[in-house]
Amino acid sequence: MEAIRQFDTCNIANAIEKFGIRLRNEGYTRPGLQCVTGGFPRLLGYAATARIRSSDPPMTGSSYLDRTDWWVGIQSLPAPRIAVIQDLHAESGLGSVVGEVHAAVLKALQCQGMITNGTVRDIPAVARMQFPMFARAAAVSHGYTHIVDYGQPVRIFGLEIRPGDLLFADCHGVVSIPHQIAAQLPDVAARIRVQEQRIIDLCQSPEFSTEGLLDAIRTTDQGN
């Protein structure tokens, strides 16, 4: 599985298309998600899902640190893990989903990072932990953030994610990787990258010609 990490999400999305197992406009997030902790990290792991509310107070308790049962749910999934948290009031993003304390908890639970459609905070401190956070934006306060449930399907920027889904995230967004083809993807992605590099090299060469470009494209099409 780690061989996937040498590629980016664009390479992997192209490779998935070759198997024809889903529509080309499915299986990835829509625009708006960003890595707020900076850099260009690549997250690869199994989704540990939860749903929270940040705008309204919970019926009992005060925050989602009051709910420790979801930690057991996280640990029931294979590692490496990615915490995937849907804010049911994400349009306002009133309360931060994760900050420094909970990032430390999630990292201790072998989560490689987290993904949310909501907001996060304590960004410099979490960045120093090397715990990537992919979110809509930053927020000052956690507001009334509390867990509604966990271990259920969530929806993040148009992508439906189920517990245990294999996810790959980078600066472009998140792509969901079908388990049945995961082992084959690195080889397919590598072939595509070689084919694309031929075209790029030709375009940057003093020997460039449109005839040569058409030949390179035909060769690429024949190899697909």
Language-model-detected regions and their locations in the chain:
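Beta-strand-loop-alpha-helix segment that lines the small-molecule cofactor/substrate pocket
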Residues: 170
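Channel- or pocket-lining gating/hinge segments that regulate access to a cavity or pore
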Residues: 173-175
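Feature captures the catalytic cores and cofactor-binding loops of soluble hydro-lyases/lyases
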Residues: 1-163, 177-224
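C-terminal binding/interaction regions
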Residues: 167
